[in-house]
Amino acid sequence: DKNKKPIRVGGRRPPGFTPFR
């Protein structure tokens, strides 16, 4: 879906953490 795009929060992505907005 277009609403489910992996975005980088604060420009950094913690290991094993995938932010889906």
Curated annotation (Swiss-Prot):
Subcellular localization(s) per the UniProt record: Secreted
Family, similarity comment: Belongs to the bradykinin-related peptide family.
Organism placement in taxonomy: Eukaryota, Metazoa, Ecdysozoa, Arthropoda, Hexapoda
GO MF term list: toxin activity
Tissue specificity field: Expressed by the venom gland.
Record keywords, A-Z: G-protein coupled receptor impairing toxin, Mast cell degranulation, Secreted, Toxin
Stretches with biased composition (Basic residues): 1-11
Role: Causes constriction of the isolated rat ileum muscles (is 13-fold less potent than bradykinin (BK)), as well as degranulation of mast cells (is 7-fold more potent than BK). In vivo, causes algesic effects. Muscle constriction and algesic effects are partially mediated by bradykinin receptors B2 (BDKRB2).
GO terms under cellular component: extracellular region
Predominant location category: secreted
Organism name: Protopolybia exigua
Protein name: Protopolybiakinin-1
